[in-house]
Regions:
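Short loop segments at secondary-structure junctions
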Residues: 1-2, 13-14, 80-85, 105-107
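N-terminal strand-loop-strand
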Residues: 1-22
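Active-site segment of metal-dependent pyrophosphate-handling enzymes
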Residues: 46-85
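NUDIX/MutT-family hydrolases
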Residues: 76, 88-121
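Short, charged, intrinsically disordered terminal tails
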Residues: 116, 125, 129-133
Length: 133
């Protein structure tokens, strides 16, 4: 794609149209966080990817409806595109994802909506600098 790195981003259902996020989700029983990353990327973007390496964790407190506070740890991984067409989502995924698209990695700090995800995109960019496309 023109000699640039891209990342697969999603526009979550029920959020404002300006919200762009990285694919993520809950770890299923018997699954590792790395396996979750590959599965969620496929479900939420329509892409098959290979695990490259872990970028890091984002820790935060989420407040649910009703005021319950939940501590969350989200693990992010660098994945390498294998195949698929972005936006061809798994059946039923419209409940979670309204749209998926490629976004330029060098624009992540302006495009991603969440600070922790912007940090992970910057880590990915630093890791990929000088690496062959």
């Amino acid at each position: 794609m023109g000699g640039r790195w891209f990342f697969a981003a999603t526009r979550p259902t029920g959020r404002p149209k300006a919200v762009w996020a990285l694919p993520k989700g809950l770890v299923d029983p018997g699954e590792t966080p790395a396996e979750t990353a590959v599965r969620e990327a496929a479900e939420e973007t329509g892409l098959t990817a290979l695990l490259d390496e872990k970028l890091g964790d984002v820790r935060y407190v989420h407040t649910r409806r009703g005021g319950e506070r939940v501590f969350k740890i989200v693990s992010f991984y660098l994945l390498r595109y294998r195949r698929g067409r972005i936006g061809e989502l798994s059946p039923g995924m419209e409940i979670e994802v309204e749209e998926a698209r490629w976004l330029p990695l060098d624009e992540a700090s302006q495009l991603l909506s969440y600070a922790g995800e912007r940090d992970m995109a910057e880590r990915a960019r630093a890791h990929l600098d000088g690496r062959a496309l």
